[in-house]
A protein has these predicted regions:
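C-terminal His-loop and adjacent cap/lid subdomain of alpha/beta-hydrolase
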Residues: 1-430
């Protein structure tokens, strides 16, 4: 079923709902999330087919616009759609269509999203706790404005001084140096850094003694690497957004190419300055994020009070890869902590965060990074099986098949001191 939703005079939300034959329907509904700036029904190729194979009625939408962030220029209602309204309206109308088609409402509804979809997931739990019974929130691009401010600060510093860029060849060298320094902190040398927050790598040890080679860094490149992993702060030292984690050595600005990618640039030229010709060289870490928040602060899913979602029996399963080169993994740790600070430390019966060693952005990576998140969430919500561990599998850097338990944050998978380090049974959550 294809539909266009118009909850405001300037709304145009494109929605697609897939309905399996009645005999194959599992009685449930799954909404899938978006990525980047949305702008298309991005679940059509992967997420929606996966949901359909499980027997779900499933839906996706385009967040209320086409393309990148340029839609925000002169269209405040479309900004609201992108921020939160499109997901909610698409969910309400999709469930109505499902009910009409099968002549009964879905018995349970789930949301499954990563990146922008992760922010959408958190926004649903915060604003519309009645929409979903279980929510899967991966690598949330959140807070949207602070995330893009941190990226702008790192990228523009290098674009203004191209000699400070770190070429891809050197990024591989940096990644190896980080691995050599921190791989063994978890007790096992297996090319997996299980707890990057415990890594205290100092990039100055890579500085060239003379000249410039692929196996060392210039002084300016050392500063760039340090900036990449350090938190972005205002001129007064206030945190803007965490730095990337030492779980990997990628995502360092190269200094190559033109202006910052539209993904991050659009937040400031359209949301903040509302000027398509705004010059990125004028980016100011103190004033520009504040201007964006003044105009569209509702885009950030930062409310830590999820009491209504908890009260109706909802389950929120968060995850983030420690080697994410796009969104600092610590951002998920910080939001999870904010909920515990607000609601109390004992929330594990409905809220859990799993940090995945070696996983990149949303999925992939060299190691046990393949995870059946949906089954874990289903078992939790439908059978009361609290995910004390979740199984992960994959291929390591040496080509060996690996399995390992994922542990609810802040626990880590710890080697028992005996057994095959490629097998999950040799590890315990501590």
């Amino acid at each position: 079923v294809v539909a266009v939703l118009r909850p405001s005079s300037d709304s145009e939300i494109n929605l697609e709902v897939w309905l399996p034959p009645a005999a194959e329907w599992n009685g449930k509904f799954q909404m899938v999330g978006n990525g980047g700036w949305g702008g298309s029904i991005q679940g059509l190729e992967s997420a929606m087919p996966a949901a359909l194979r499980r027997g779900y009625a499933t839906a996706g939408h385009d967040t209320g616009h086409r393309g990148g962030g340029e839609f925000a220029l002169g269209h405040p209602e479309k900004v609201i759609d992108f921020a939160y309204r499109a997901v909610h309206e698409a969910t309400v109308q999709s469930k109505a269509l499902v009910g009409a088609f099968y002549e009964r409402a879905p018995r349970l509804s789930y949301f499954n999203g990563c990146s922008l979809g992760g922010r959408q997931a958190l926004m649903e739990a915060q604003r519309y706790p009645e929409d979903f019974d279980g929510i899967l929130a991966g690598a949330a691009a959140n807070p949207h404005i602070a995330l893009h401010a941190g990226s702008m600060a790192r990228v523009t510093a290098v674009l203004k001084d191209p000699e400070s860029g770190v070429p891809q060849a050197k990024q591989a060298f940096v990644a190896r140096a980080i691995m050599n320094a921190c791989d063994g902190l978890d007790g096992v040398k297996d090319t997996i850094i299980s707890d990057p927050m415990a890594c205290r790598f100092d990039p100055s040890v890579l500085r060239c003694k003379s000249g410039d080679r692929d196996d060392c860094l210039t002084a300016k490149q050392v500063d760039t690497v340090r900036r990449n992993y350090a938190p972005t702060t205002t001129s007064q030292g206030a945190l803007v957004f965490p730095g990337l984690s030492f779980g990997g050595g990628r995502g360092i600005p190269t200094g190559e190419g033109g202006p910052p990618a539209p993904l991050i640039l659009d937040t400031f030229r359209y949301l903040a300055h509302q000027d398509r010709n705004w010059d990125w060289r004028r980016f100011d870490i103190d004033s520009d994020p504040e201007l964006a928040r003044k105009n569209a602060g509702f885009i950030d899913a930062v409310n830590p009070d999820l009491s209504p979602f908890k009260a109706r029996g909802g389950k929120l399963l968060m995850y983030h890869g420690w080697s994410d080169p796009l969104i600092a993994p610590e951002s998920s740790v910080r939001y999870h902590a904010s909920v515990l600070d607000r609601m109390g430390s004992d929330q594990g019966n409905w809220l859990r965060l799993f940090m995945v060693p070696a996983m990149g952005h949303c999925s992939g990576g060299s190691g046990p990074t393949s995870v059946d998140w949906v089954s874990a969430l289903e078992a939790w919500r439908e059978q009361g099986k609290v995910p004390d561990t979740i199984a992960a599998s994959g291929t390591g850097a040496t080509g060996a098949r690996m399995t390992r338990p994922l542990c609810p944050h802040p626990q880590r998978a710890t080697y028992k001191g005996r057994g095959d380090t490629n097998k999950a049974e040799s590890f315990a959550c501590k």
